[in-house]
């Protein structure tokens, strides 16, 4: 996921209301952020899995990599991370900024449900501290702010780091057309890093296309 690095170097996807990409994705700051990524990629400091075919964390990390970006579920799936020398750390800052991406699943009660009361009780149960702490063991971060200071989180060398990083996390563009927007982003990245397209022009074109998905 390139978004965190793009944000880290000062890039912006849209306005705060997620209504327009033109003027944001193709702003001077965003173009500078992309050029920084190009510079790091050319120096082989930064790799892009879908561009370089580089291995991801699930296929095995070796000493070739100093850092990789992965969600908390990675540590919930592998008990031997520490033995391999893999430890959780916040993303390095750049000009005082750090960045990450936040996502998740939804739980809802449908207005057409025949068992609204039971469904509501189930939703309350799933969002209770008891269940959220249990899900933490599987690598799912709790959704409750009340658990940030819980000892199970604070005293854990993995979960405490991820909760700290959440302070600078941003959401992907919340749109029913998100799949199309992701495709536009991917095509832009491919054109820049594989085909050698001019970053400014590629970002301008992508911004216009994303505008069409946001309208």
List the model feature ranges, each with a label.
Residues 89, 136-187, 191:
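Long, aromatic- and glycine/proline-rich binding clefts that accommodate carbohydrate-like moieties
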Residues 199-211:
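Short, well-structured alpha-helical segments that form the helix of a local strand-helix-strand
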Residues 43-46, 79-140, 190, 194-197:
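Extracytoplasmic/periplasmic substrate-recognition and gating elements
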Residues 48-59:
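Short helix-initiation/N-cap motifs at beta->coil->alpha
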Residues 66-71, 87:
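Paired acidic/hydrophobic, glycine-rich loop segments that form the ligand-binding mouth/hinge
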Residues 54, 69-75, 105:
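Beta->alpha turn/N-cap motifs
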Residues 1-23, 65:
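Extracytoplasmic/periplasmic solute-binding protein
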Residues 19-50:
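Glycine-centered hinge/linker elements that transmit conformational signals in sensory
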């Amino acid at each position: 996921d390139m978004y965190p690095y793009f944000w880290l170097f000062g890039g912006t996807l849209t306005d705060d209301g997620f209504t327009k990409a033109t003027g944001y994705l193709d702003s001077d700051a965003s173009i500078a952020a992309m050029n920084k990524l190009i510079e790091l990629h050319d120096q082989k400091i930064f790799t892009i899995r879908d561009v370089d075919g580089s291995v991801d964390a699930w296929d095995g990390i070796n000493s070739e990599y100093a850092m990789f970006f992965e969600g908390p579920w990675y540590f919930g799936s592998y008990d031997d991370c520490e033995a391999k020398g893999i430890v959780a750390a916040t993303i390095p800052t750049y000009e005082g900024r750090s960045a990450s991406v936040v996502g998740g699943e939804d739980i809802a009660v449908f207005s057409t449900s025949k068992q609204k009361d039971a469904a509501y009780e189930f939703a309350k149960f799933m969002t209770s501290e008891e269940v959220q702490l249990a899900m933490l063991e599987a690598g799912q971060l709790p959704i409750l702010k009340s658990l940030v200071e819980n000892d199970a989180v604070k005293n854990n060398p993995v979960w405490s780091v991820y909760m700290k990083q959440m302070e600078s996390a941003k959401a992907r563009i919340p749109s029913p057309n998100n799949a199309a927007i992701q495709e536009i982003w991917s095509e832009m990245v491919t054109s820049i890093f594989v085909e050698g397209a001019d970053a400014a022009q590629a970002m301008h074109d992508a911004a216009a296309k994303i505008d069409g998905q946001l309208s």
